[in-house]
Regions:
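Domain-level signal for soluble alpha/beta catalytic cores
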Residues: 1-216
Length: 216
């Protein structure tokens, strides 16, 4: 059964956070965690393996902030494609090391810049930023894409378009809401869910916004 069908029919367990695990392992404030895919590959794979042993069936790549606004020759850092490829391979190796079968999700977070007209990032450029990571992830063998921590349905659309135009991978979208159940852009939960679902998301959810008290 393909992952697209499994997402629709089964209850699957993702892993947990990567950033907090890397901070515990020595990641310094302001240090780009995606660089650890090359400099601390053993640590990244170790985090993946810990989550797999805990029961995770889907592992996110260490690529949350991996885009051309931070990485590439212009920034004096490795190319996005290099970091994404390394990240996917580390997740795959983790499953192999644990003797388990599972799925690797290419993790895409926000670009970190506001979109026009509220900011200076054009829509087309944002799609292109996501597309670079999507193409590399697909080529490296990712099974699906996780578009996460979206606070704006407009930015979620950009990431979704990149996935649909540059791959045939299924995708999951998660949003982050404030205490009033609103995105930073002002959209409510229902609107966000409708937008993502109508664009073909295999699953829609939320993360990083509300704590247990607010959720209850």
């Amino acid at each position: 059964m393909e992952i697209r069908e499994r997402l629709e029919k089964e209850r699957l367990f993702f892993d947990g956070g990567m950033g907090t695990m890397l901070q515990s392992a020595g990641l310094m404030p302001g240090e780009l965690p995606e660089l650890w895919n090359l400099s601390h590959a053993d640590v990244i794979q170790g985090v993946h393996e810990a989550y797999i042993r805990a029961g995770a069936q889907i592992i996110k790549t260490n690529t949350f902030g991996c885009n051309g606004l931070k990485f590439g020759k212009a920034h004096g850092t490795p190319a996005v494609s290099t970091l994404v490829t390394a990240a996917v391979k580390l997740a795959q190796k983790a499953f192999q090391a644990c003797g388990e079968k599972g799925c690797v999700a290419l993790d895409l977070g926000p670009t970190g810049k506001l979109l026009q007209p509220y900011g200076d990032l054009p829509f087309e450029e944002a799609v292109s930023l996501y597309a670079e990571a999507v193409e590399a992830g697909k080529k490296a063998g990712a099974d699906l894409v996780l578009i996460e921590t979206m606070s704006d349905t407009y930015e979620a659309k950009e990431a979704i378009l990149a996935v649909k135009e540059h791959s045939n991978l299924p995708f999951v979208v998660t949003f982050t809401f404030d205490e009033e159940g609103k995105l930073l852009s002002g959209a409510d939960v229902e609107t966000a869910m409708i937008v993502a679902s109508s664009l073909g998301a295999s699953a829609v959810g939320f993360n990083c916004g509300l704590g247990p008290k607010e959720i209850s």
